[in-house]
């Protein structure tokens, strides 16, 4: 704001100190300076706005808004006031007010290019595409520059993209945009590459692929110069759309002759060759094969072409990988066609061996060969690995010393072999003792490799880090398959040690986060996740690793913090993408604008966003709303309406990165598309249950007095259902969602450890909390019915309520029984974690909170009836008036409820005392059968202290249990 050029206006000189104060964050001084200036110059509008900015930044939003509107009502046209108001409205998150500001300015100064331009950008921020189109044309009429004209054209395209009616898009908006561009083409007014890109975009969206191809191949296509091969790539895309496989083949062949290392064109070349074979295409007897030149239409041609590229590469000083990998890809495709024997390109095993000899010292060698290992017969895998090891330069092994590499090149080669060994499943077929031997060897190689990285910076990874990761993966195998928790403690120790040598290794941190969470130890996770320094979209793609466990492990403060991190990103998404769109208009990057819109929609419809939003509101209610009054206030402050569902169920997008962990597992053990599909299904079911629970809770305060007249018809006013009907409908939907979820859980789906994280749904059902919560909401419905009908003649309803109260109390006792047990069990020096106990306890606390809100509602209904009966007794002095048994039943229920809560608090205190009494340093974490090397004691102690320390946070649950118990005595 303070970056202001040379000015002649004396007002600018007067305003400069205020700008400086605001830029330096000294908002109070800015307000004082503005007040001084306004005493002398009352009509200096900009000073008022700058004062409003200071007020806004000091939390005095209402004063700031009032002051800003005073100035806006005057419809200022000076640049300083307009810019200051724009900044203020942005900080207020009111971009729609900026449009009104510049609409007024444009009316007063109709020929101002600057104001028209600002108006266009203001419309862009709020997505007013129709008005953007009009503003763009108005700007072009004032200043006939091409960019302004094409702003209007692009706004038409945006109208077509946002139109719900696809037919309207293709019959009105896009044809109009096409005619506008064609007018400029005919008048020979196309000047910039961006304008050609826009024309191409319109034709492509209209499905006019041939016309788009003609544009790219014609004179206009010559303007496409900013990106390498931009013209060729667009031609290729159109050839594919038009199924012009001869041209597709010839163009990809020609591009490969220029650059034989471009992998994307190998794939296109192979696709086109086999398409032509399928169609039995033959070249014409005379003339060119196609518009792009010679065409290869047989397998023989493809084989010869690849062999020629390899020969050419061997004669070049530059080592290229493309031709060698293309040969393996061709073998795969020929084999799938059943004609590999006819065209002998060589044995895949030998080809991969030769490839390893050429590129084995490159980190990319493993990822290159990973794609083709399925060409190897299972019986040859061990032989293949031994063959690779035979060419790795290692020292001579002795009885007490491994064969080790002498340099980084040798280390990379050996590391590639080890990765391939795991990928081929050779480690998985070993027994436990063999796996432990592998772990020992890998860790010795890891420590030896550290010698090569002594000069590495803290931000760099050690060359041997993958050895440590692979050792951890093998230990995880032992843990998951044999159930030996000692192995996972050892894995934690190795990861902690690895992190001291490679503080920036994200894989170490991610694995630590995953394992600590599974063990139920959340305290170290927060710092580990923070150290990952997740940026922007990563809050959506990997945030689930943190938010899934925070609340479920009783870490309420951390859960609130992690939700805030994620929500801050999602809420800023709308503002950020608007700025990206504006920049794209300014610089003519029109093809990026639909991408930005799609990106924004993808984030707005994010599954993780919906989950975090729902869990955060539930968490806030549980932490803040202790009694029904504050529950009503909390729900009001959150603007929660039970009848409104804000989750875009039909458009939910799963943006989680489920491949974030490095994995060297064979295909049958790795994360599959089926796993991802099932995980999304499970996450959606759980979100539906949580969303309905939240809406049911938000419906409770609306049921309190005044109630509908006795025996009244349940009617709808203005199409809005009565409050209890909303609750009953939501309860019905919840029961359906629960049944669907139970059927899913019965499948007992097991995800890979490094794959999707299971939801809390299974524990929710098995703990009995689900049944308890549903039962409590049914109780609300019955009590509401009693309230509307009165005590007289409702014996059946009263008996139903009495039975519900008794069964609800029994259900709660059953839930509490699942919370009993120690969080850590120590036996023979070994420790075993019981995170299920903690998760059950957290669900129990949540259920208790819901039950207490329901009980509070019941009390609010029953109390007036009891008082009324007591008044009648006193007034008539009659002893014949009998108190209905429902009051006694409710009182017994409340007494029992308080006993359950008291027992729960005592249990939590007992858990804490048990944890503190543990002498953690005496735990034997270095099982001699697993310990591969003499690890530093500090790493072992770090894990010893870090994990149990997490459970001490359980104290946060205890006051919550006690505080949410309102006085519900009647």
Swiss-Prot record:
This is N-alpha-acetyltransferase 25, NatB auxiliary subunit. Component of the N-terminal acetyltransferase B (NatB) complex which is composed of NAA20 and NAA25. One of its GO terms (biological process) is cytoskeleton organization. Keywords: Cytoplasm, Repeat, TPR repeat. TPR repeats lie at residues 11-44, 45-78, 79-112, 114-146. It is found in: Cytoplasm. One of its GO terms (molecular function) is acetyltransferase activator activity. GO terms for cellular component: cytoplasm; NatB complex. Belongs to the MDM20/NAA25 family. Gene3D superfamilies: 1.25.40.1040. Non-catalytic subunit of the NatB complex which catalyzes acetylation of the N-terminal methionine residues of peptides beginning with Met-Asp, Met-Glu, Met-Asn and Met-Gln. May play a role in normal cell-cycle progression.
């Amino acid at each position: 704001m303070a970056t202001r050029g040379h000015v002649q206006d004396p007002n600018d000189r007067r305003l400069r100190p205020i700008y400086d104060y605001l830029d330096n964050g000294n908002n109070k001084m800015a307000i004082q300076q503005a007040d001084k200036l306004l005493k002398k110059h009352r009509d200096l509008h900009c000073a008022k706005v700058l004062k409003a900015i200071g007020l806004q930044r000091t939390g005095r939003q209402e004063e700031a808004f009032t002051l800003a509107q005073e100035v806006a009502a005057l419809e200022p046209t000076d640049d300083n006031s307009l810019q200051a108001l724009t900044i203020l409205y942005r900080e207020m998150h009111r971009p729609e007010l900026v449009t009104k500001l510049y609409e007024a300015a444009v009316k007063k100064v109709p020929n101002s290019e600057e104001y028209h331009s600002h108006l266009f950008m203001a419309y862009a921020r709020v997505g007013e595409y129709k008005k953007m189109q009009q503003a763009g044309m108005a700007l072009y009429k004032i200043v006939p520059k091409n960019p302004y004209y094409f702003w209007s054209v692009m706004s038409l395209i945006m109208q077509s993209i946002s139109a719900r009616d696809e037919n309207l898009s293709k019959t009105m908006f896009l044809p109009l945009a096409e005619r506008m561009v064609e007018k400029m083409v005919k008048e020979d007014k196309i000047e910039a590459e961006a304008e050609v890109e826009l024309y191409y975009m319109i034709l492509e969206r209209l499905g006019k692929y041939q016309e788009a191809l003609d544009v790219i191949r014609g004179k206009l296509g010559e303007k496409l110069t900013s990106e390498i091969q931009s013209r060729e790539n667009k031609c290729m895309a159109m050839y594919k759309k038009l199924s012009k496989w001869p041209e597709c083949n010839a163009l990809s062949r020609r591009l490969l002759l220029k650059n034989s290392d471009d992998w994307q064109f190998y794939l296109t070349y192979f696709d086109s060759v086999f398409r032509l074979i399928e169609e039995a295409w033959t070249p014409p007897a005379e003339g060119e094969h196609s518009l792009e030149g010679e065409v290869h239409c047989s397998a023989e041609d493809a084989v010869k072409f690849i062999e020629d590229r390899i020969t050419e590469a061997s004669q070049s000083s530059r080592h290229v990988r493309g031709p060698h990998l293309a040969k393996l890809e061709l073998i795969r495709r020929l084999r799938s066609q059943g004609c590999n024997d006819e065209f002998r390109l060589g044995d895949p095993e030998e080809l991969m061996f030769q490839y390893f000899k050429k590129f084995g010292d490159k980190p990319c060698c493993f990822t290159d060969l990973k794609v083709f290992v399925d060409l190897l017969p299972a019986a040859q895998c061990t032989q293949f690995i031994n063959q690779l090891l035979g060419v790795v330069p290692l020292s001579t092994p002795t009885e007490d010393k491994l064969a080790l590499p002498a340099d980084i090149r040798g280390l990379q080669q050996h590391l590639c072999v080890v990765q391939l060994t795991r990928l081929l499943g050779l480690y998985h077929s070993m027994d436990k003792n063999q796996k432990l031997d592998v772990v020992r060897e890998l860790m010795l190689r890891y420590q030896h490799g550290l010698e090569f990285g002594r000069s590495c910076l803290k931000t760099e990874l050690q060359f041997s880090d993958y050895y440590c990761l692979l050792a951890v993966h093998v230990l995880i195998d032992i843990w998951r398959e044999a159930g030996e928790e000692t192995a996972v403690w050892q894995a934690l120790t190795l990861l902690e040690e690895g992190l001291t040598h490679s503080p920036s290794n994200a894989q170490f941190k991610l694995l630590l986060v995953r394992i600590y969470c599974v063990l139920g130890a959340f305290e170290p996770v927060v710092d580990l996740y923070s150290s990952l320094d997740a940026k922007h979209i990563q809050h959506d793609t990997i945030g689930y690793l943190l938010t899934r466990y925070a609340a479920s492990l009783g870490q309420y403060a951390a859960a609130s913090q992690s939700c805030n991190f994620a929500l801050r990103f999602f809420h800023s998404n709308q503002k950020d993408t608007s700025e990206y769109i504006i920049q794209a208009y300014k610089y003519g990057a029109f093809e990026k604008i639909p991408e930005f819109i799609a990106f924004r929609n993808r984030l707005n419809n994010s599954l993780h966003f919906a989950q975090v939003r729902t869990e955060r509101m539930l968490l806030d209610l549980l932490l803040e709303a202790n009694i029904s009054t504050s529950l009503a206030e909390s729900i009001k402050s959150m603007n929660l309406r039970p009848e409104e569902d804000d989750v875009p169920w039909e458009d939910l997008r799963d943006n989680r990165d489920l491949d974030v962990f490095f994995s060297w597992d064979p295909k049958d053990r790795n994360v599959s598309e089926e796993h991802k599909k099932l995980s999304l299904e499970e996450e959606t079911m759980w979100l539906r249950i949580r969303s309905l629970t939240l809406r049911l809770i938000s419906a409770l305060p609306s049921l309190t007095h005044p109630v509908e007249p006795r025996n009244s018809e349940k009617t709808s006013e203005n199409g809005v259902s009565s409050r209890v009907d909303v609750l009953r409908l939501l309860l019905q939907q919840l029961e359906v969602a629960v049944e669907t979820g139970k059927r899913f859980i019965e499948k007992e789906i097991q995800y890979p450890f490094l794959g999707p994280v299971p939801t809390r749904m299974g524990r929710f059902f098995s703990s009995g909390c689900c049944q308890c919560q549903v039962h409590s909401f049914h109780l609300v419905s019955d009590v509401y019915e009693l309230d509307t009908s009165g005590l007289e003649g409702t014996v059946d309803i009263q008996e139903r309520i009495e039975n519900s109260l008794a069964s609800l109390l029994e259900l709660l006792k059953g839930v509490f029984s699942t919370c009993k047990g120690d969080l850590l069990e120590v036996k023979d020096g070994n420790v075993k974690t019981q995170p299920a106990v903690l998760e059950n306890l957290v669900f129990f606390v949540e259920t208790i909170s819901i039950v207490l809100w329901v009980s509070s509602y019941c009390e609010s209904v029953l109390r007036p009836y009891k008082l009324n009966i007591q008044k009648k007794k006193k007034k008539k002095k009659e002893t014949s008036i009998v108190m209905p048994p429902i009051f006694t039943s409710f009182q017994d229920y409340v007494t029992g409820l308080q006993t359950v809560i008291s027992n729960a608090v005592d249990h939590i205190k007992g858990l804490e005392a048990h944890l503190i009494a543990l002498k953690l340093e005496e735990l034997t974490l270095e099982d001699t059968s697993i310990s591969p090397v003499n690890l530093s004691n500090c790493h072992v102690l770090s894990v010893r202290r870090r994990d149990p320390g997490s459970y001490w946070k359980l104290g946060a649950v205890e006051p919550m249990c006690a505080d949410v118990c309102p006085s519900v005595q009647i």
